[in-house]
Regions:
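Conserved catalytic-core segment of nucleotide-activated headgroup transferases in glycan assembly
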Residues: 21, 211-286, 290-295, 302
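Acidic donor-binding loop of glycosyltransferase active sites
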Residues: 187, 287, 302-316, 327-330
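Conserved acidic donor-binding segment of nucleotide-sugar-dependent glycosyltransferases
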Residues: 346-356, 364-370
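A short, well-ordered alpha-helix in the C-terminal region of glycosyltransferases
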Residues: 364, 371-386, 392-398
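Acceptor-binding helix/loop patch of EC 2.4 sugar-transfer enzymes
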Residues: 69-98, 141-177, 238
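Membrane-proximal helix-turn-helix segments that form the acceptor-binding/catalytic region
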Residues: 24, 103-110, 148, 163-189
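N-terminal subdomain of nucleotide-sugar transferases
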Residues: 1-65
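Short hydrophobic beta-strand element within catalytic cores of glycosyltransferases
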Residues: 320-324, 330-334
Length: 409
């Protein structure tokens, strides 16, 4: 059967977990289905990497060009100013401003007409306005990545003044209305946690939902040896994210000093794109190693014995935790950090909210090789059983097949 899948950004270079999710999903779905894929570009970009990668999966690649593509710098700046004005003057989100244009719609319709898909699937909800124009026989799917309900619940934790917070609430509530409107038009909503499934069914039990964790091809991680330093820990994630920055600051300011007081030789690896040096430099010494973005994180992660993730707020699935666990690295973090992957407390790591308790559990693993070995084995087994491509997107593929079969009959 034919699937047309759209991602409202550039798939490559892969820098975040949303891109990882899309790439891995495409890899598994392409085994069972004929796929046409589009991502979106706002300026001249080399598509050779994306085209080459997807051709290896026998995926037809049709990039979509946003307004201003191939235009000069002045035009792009003017267009950007117009988008900013729409964003600030109205409740429409910046993401919608980018994709809700006649040019984008025209390109999508052209691809739909040429490929005649059985399934039309979008990542995020922004392109849901297209659904009402599609032939009713085409199944409509949304992979949410996150829900607006999650963001609304966190609004008071944002670093905003009263006016900014009020404006943000208006935009989020507008987006929530749009999100739910598009969900009602769908044949299937794909979420990455059971918590998201519950949030959707709390307002409408009739919305068809499937939970598909962030599956990955974990073979290279599972086979990679753990060469951990007996006293090394790590913080791993995209550090351009405000919630990860807060968690890192908490670790450096309140947790790592406790750990070092108990085990002075402990090293901390900070791994991830856009490390906030304004925060790190306040605490930097020889025990803190900052890698920044690395193309292959396995050699760095595998030096560590524990991953520490003291997130207080945040949304979405913790795909970086899965990579660490596949390398046999136990995780100590808050419930906010670990609930989406359904970590079993005491088996693959520990869930604690208090700084002293987090530090205590980290030191317990560092000082107890028998416990570390047991948890390390548990982590690899847990990652393989729950987050492989087959156990996640393989199940999604079966569900899509079943839906198409029902429509055909």
């Amino acid at each position: 059967m034919n699937l047309y899948i759209i991602f409202p950004g550039a798939l490559y270079p892969i820098e975040g977990m949303s891109q990882v999710r899309v790439r891995c999903q495409l890899e598994r779905l392409s085994i069972d289905h004929k796929i046409v894929f589009s991502d979106m570009h706002s300026q001249k970009t080399n598509h050779n990497i994306t085209s080459k990668e997807l051709s290896q999966l026998n995926i037809i690649y049709n990039p979509i060009y946003l307004s201003g593509y191939k235009s000069g710098t002045i035009f792009r700046k003017l267009y950007f100013i117009v988008k900013l004005l729409k964003y600030h003057l109205f409740t429409i989100t910046f993401e919608e401003c980018r994709v809700k244009t006649r040019g984008v719609r025209k390109q999508i319709f052209s691809i739909v007409e040429q490929t005649n898909p059985d399934v039309f699937m979008i990542h995020y909800w922004y392109l849901g306005y297209i659904f009402k124009y599609l032939n009713p026989r085409i199944l409509k799917l949304i992979d949410t990545h996150h829900l607006l309900e999650e963001k609304i619940a966190l609004i008071d934790s944002y670093d905003l003044n009263i006016i900014q917070r009020r404006r943000q609430k208006l935009k989020l509530n507008y987006s929530l209305h749009r999100q739910r409107e598009y969900f009602k038009l769908c044949n299937l909503i794909i979420v990455n946690s059971k918590a998201q499934e519950t949030l959707i069914h709390n307002w409408n039990k009739n919305i068809p939902v499937i939970v598909a964790f962030n599956g990955q091809n974990l073979d290279s991680f599972l086979k990679y040896g753990n060469h951990s330093d007996s006293s090394a820990i790590c913080f791993y994630g995209s550090l351009s994210n405000q919630f990860n920055r807060k968690a890192l600051k908490r670790l450096l300011e309140q947790i790592f000093p406790i750990i070092k007081n108990i085990i002075p030789e402990t090293k901390l690896y900070i791994i991830g794109i856009s490390p906030p040096m304004d925060i790190i430099n306040k605490f930097k010494d020889d025990s803190i190693i900052v890698t920044g973005y690395v193309t292959d994180i396995k050699p760095y992660l595998s030096r560590c014995k524990v991953m520490v993730l003291p997130l207080e707020t945040g949304v979405g699935f913790r795909g970086r935790v899965v990579e660490a666990m596949a390398l046999g690295i136990p995780v100590v973090g808050t419930s906010n950090a670990l609930q989406s992957i359904e970590l079993e407390n005491g088996k693959q790591g520990f869930i604690e909210e208090d700084n002293n308790k987090i530090a205590e559990k980290v030191c317990l693993i560092l000082n107890n090789n028998e416990l570390f070995t047991e948890m390390s084995i548990n982590c690899r087994k847990f990652a393989e059983a729950n987050f492989s491509l087959e156990s996640t997107f393989g199940n999604l593929s079966k569900t899509i097949k079943s839906l198409v079969a029902k429509v055909s009959n």
